């Protein structure tokens, strides 16, 4: 399961995810309670993402410090990260460092929250998409017309 999707969906769950999976694994029907509204997940990445280039990773990203201007929100999920001498740093080679999630009653509110949370993150050479959720107005109309949403 793509970790961006699972981190984003987990943010919308009221039911603890551990309990949900325990019930599922035990053959019980899990009681899934979720928040109303929308969730958006945005990947914070560094070079070489989206490419596989060990030399670029070694030169620009390996062991780069991950700093938060203020204590991070609960909805920041780590990916290729490790602790080195008490400091969170970039690890792995995928270039995917964090998944930041925003929630809101509307798509615009979820967008505002996720991008506000991203402003709290400082990683050398980091980048991320700034258009997540922008097409929701058109996409939701299509999904309604196709009968997928009611």
Descriptions of predicted regions:
Residues 1-150:
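ATP-dependent carboxylate activation and anion-phosphoryl transfer catalytic cores
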């Amino acid at each position: 399961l793509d970790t961006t999707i699972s981190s984003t969906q987990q943010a919308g769950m009221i039911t603890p995810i551990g309990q949900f999976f325990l019930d599922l694994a035990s053959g019980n029907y899990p009681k899934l309670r979720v928040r109303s509204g929308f969730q958006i997940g945005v990947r914070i990445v560094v070079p070489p993402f989206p490419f596989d280039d060990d030399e670029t990773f070694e030169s620009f990203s390996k062991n780069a410090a991950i700093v938060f201007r203020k204590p991070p929100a609960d909805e920041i999920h780590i990916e290729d990260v490790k602790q080195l001498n008490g400091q969170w740093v970039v690890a792995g080679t995928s270039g995917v460092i964090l998944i930041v999630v925003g929630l809101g009653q509307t798509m615009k509110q979820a967008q505002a929250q996720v991008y506000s949370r991203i402003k709290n993150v400082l990683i050398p050479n980091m980048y991320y998409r700034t258009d997540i959720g922008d097409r929701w107005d058109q996409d939701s109309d299509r999904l309604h017309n196709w009968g997928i949403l009611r």
